[in-house]
Amino acid sequence: MNIDEIKQILPHRFPMLLVDRIVEKSEDHAKAIKNVTASEIFFLGHFPAYPIYPGVLIIEGLAQTAGLMLLNRGESVIPVFAGIDNARFKSEVRPGDVLEYEVWLKERKLGMAKVEAIAKVQGKIVATATLLVGVRKNEK
């Protein structure tokens, strides 16, 4: 799934659209990538002398990947980030890195989904979390 297809599902736009491409997708699993560039707006303040991609944005990218796993084009709902448990950050993400997001659906009921999530760079885990993602009606 390319960026144009992603934009048909997610409401996010620059600078908060944090998934560049979905490389695998099924009903209970998805893999995505985010190319971290030196021109990311977040590096203006985090941190200019030694830029590190903010951990909160890694988690948001994982949540967006979960939303893309759960939803399809043309649905009149949007994903909403409802909760996070057990978030752990294990390594820095720097300009030039390719973030690999991977999510697995563990439970789905009452419009909510519990998702296990891992972010990697070059196969090395940089973050893990359990996410709660809901859906709400899109009122365009």
Curated annotation (Swiss-Prot):
Documented EC number(s): 4.2.1.59
| Catalytically driven reaction(s) | a (3R)-hydroxyacyl-[ACP] = a (2E)-enoyl-[ACP] + H2O
Q: What UniProt keywords are attached to this protein's entry?
A: Cytoplasm, Lipid A biosynthesis, Lipid biosynthesis, Lipid metabolism, Lyase
Cellular localisation: Cytoplasm
Instruction: Quote a single Gene Ontology cellular component term.
Output: cytoplasm
Which top-level enzyme class is recorded in the Swiss-Prot or TrEMBL entry?
lyase
Recorded GO molecular functions are:
(3R)-hydroxyacyl-[acyl-carrier-protein] dehydratase activity
Gene3D superfamilies noted in UniProt: Hotdog Thioesterase
Biological processes per GO annotation = fatty acid biosynthetic process; lipid A biosynthetic process
- InterPro entries attached to this UniProt entry: FabA_FabZ (IPR013114), FabZ (IPR010084), HotDog_dom_sf (IPR029069)
* Active site (record annotation): 46
Which coarse location class describes where this protein primarily resides?
A: cytoplasm
Function according to Swiss-Prot or TrEMBL: Involved in unsaturated fatty acids biosynthesis. Catalyzes the dehydration of short chain beta-hydroxyacyl-ACPs and long chain saturated and unsaturated beta-hydroxyacyl-ACPs.
The record's comment on protein family reads: Belongs to the thioester dehydratase family. FabZ subfamily.
Q: This chain belongs to which protein, by name? A: 3-hydroxyacyl-[acyl-carrier-protein] dehydratase FabZ
Native source organism of the sequence: Pseudothermotoga lettingae (strain ATCC BAA-301 / DSM 14385 / NBRC 107922 / TMO) (Thermotoga lettingae)
